[in-house]
Amino acid sequence: MKNLEPWEAVIGLETHVQLNTKSKIFTAASTAFGDEPNTHIDPVVCGLPGTLPVLNKTVLEYAVKTSLALNLNVAEHCKFDRKQYFYPDLPKNYQISQFDEPLAENGWLEVEIAEKDKETYLKKIGIERLHMEEDAGKLVHIGSDRLAGSKYSLVDYNRAGIALVEIVSKPDIRTGREASEYASEIRRTVRYLGVSDGNMQEGSLRCDVNISVRRGPNAPFGTKVEIKNMNSFSAIQKACEYEIERQIDVYENGGEIYQETRLWDEAKQLTKSMRLKEGSSDYRYFPDPDLGPIEISKEQKDQWLDELPELPSKKRQKYVKELGLSPYDSRVISDEVFMANFFEETVANGADPKLASNWITSDIVGYLKSNKQSFAELKLSPINLAEMINMISKKVISGKIAKEILPELIQDNISPQKVVEEKGLAMISDSASISPIIEELIIEYPKEVKSFKDGKTKLLGFFVGQLMKKTKGKADPKLANKLISEKLNS
């Protein structure tokens, strides 16, 4: 991205997180994903006359826990409001949300920003509020990916009424990278809490970006534009970077920025105008008369606070300070809760932390990616990985042999000790066994021996390689190197 000086971007994110409750926010209808359209609806979802909503207690618990994890102040009482608008995805013609009395306000999230060729830094991003609301249905446009150009549209109400929390950041973000990392940290947090799977592909986590530019940090805010339709963290970063440059170009050419909603076009890598932005007054909010106010006691908040797990930011600090991992490795390990738990259990079973980190982030992650599996699907137990790492440390097997048996351990979760014994893969680590093989090599390669003695000392690697071939990788490489060097120099 080009140098923006003297311009500065001002960015805020509205993040919608679907909560993974089994039933919807105000009804017992299922929240299962991927089923036939309009199979998870009922009279409450459809807004039929005489139906009354009832708040799902688990939704409140998950929303409060998310608020506490994001350092928000949870209100002692809050209420639901009706947000009025007419659109086919809302069968009631209003959405139940929270307006002037949200569940929680004034929090923050510390984000680690790592940019290429730049020093990693921490950024504390303020969070304005978190509120609960119901999701809308989904329109499917036939013949186009959007309403314009489609032959006709169909609506699926399976998603309507699913519980959401909307997390609104303060305008503290200044770059596309910061926006992307902030959204990533939100996803890590809700996954660690177990309140959402955070899958952007399934719509479980959706981000809208509000962005403007101004001439320097002390200038007044410019006109903000909302960007939608970003289904990955890289798309968030690219959309922000494109929009920043677009707005600067408009201003520098004497143009005007309009308050509007724009869509990110992934194929063309640009934002396109969708509609002029509505203000909050257009929605005619008023308190929902069918839902009473919510009161949350201090005792209940304290209980939910005690139930919070260790969050990714704390794990990163612990891995660096207590276990000696690099900041990069600590980020990779803590990125996914299943990986972090697996790593910690491996270390608890006696494995060296750095070795455990290396095996997990390179070999195991590589295997899972090539087999299109997630870490949650890993069959290998931490006990067996720790056993394999300790066998390498104790020179029972070589690293080469460990790499060869790892796929079998992952597939069947069997003891590495058992595999090594059954296949005779134990490391040859005594001079008495290696020395006769070296004598064979001296006889087989007289020209190479002469060349070594004439000064071509790099041939030492050749002899070590031949010895490893003869022992099928089972010889101790350090011992082999030492014994061959002694023989050739004698």
From Swiss-Prot:
Keywords: ATP-binding, Ligase, Nucleotide-binding, Protein biosynthesis. GO terms for molecular function: asparaginyl-tRNA synthase (glutamine-hydrolyzing) activity; ATP binding; glutaminyl-tRNA synthase (glutamine-hydrolyzing) activity. InterPro entries: Asn/Gln-tRNA_amidoTrfase_suB/E, Asn/Gln-tRNA_Trfase_suB/E_cat, Asn/Gln_amidotransferase, Asn/Gln_tRNA_amidoTrase-B-like, GatB, GatB_C_1, GatB_Yqey_C_2, Gln-tRNA_amidoTrfase_suB_CS. It holds the Pfam family GatB_N. Disulfide bonds: none annotated. The keyword Protein biosynthesis applies. It comes from the Bacteria. GO terms for biological process: glutaminyl-tRNAGln biosynthesis via transamidation; translation. Allows the formation of correctly charged Asn-tRNA(Asn) or Gln-tRNA(Gln) through the transamidation of misacylated Asp-tRNA(Asn) or Glu-tRNA(Gln) in organisms which lack either or both of asparaginyl-tRNA or glutaminyl-tRNA synthetases. The reaction takes place in the presence of glutamine and ATP through an activated phospho-Asp-tRNA(Asn) or phospho-Glu-tRNA(Gln). Belongs to the GatB/GatE family. GatB subfamily. This is Aspartyl/glutamyl-tRNA(Asn/Gln) amidotransferase subunit B. It comes from Prochlorococcus marinus subsp. pastoris (strain CCMP1986 / NIES-2087 / MED4).
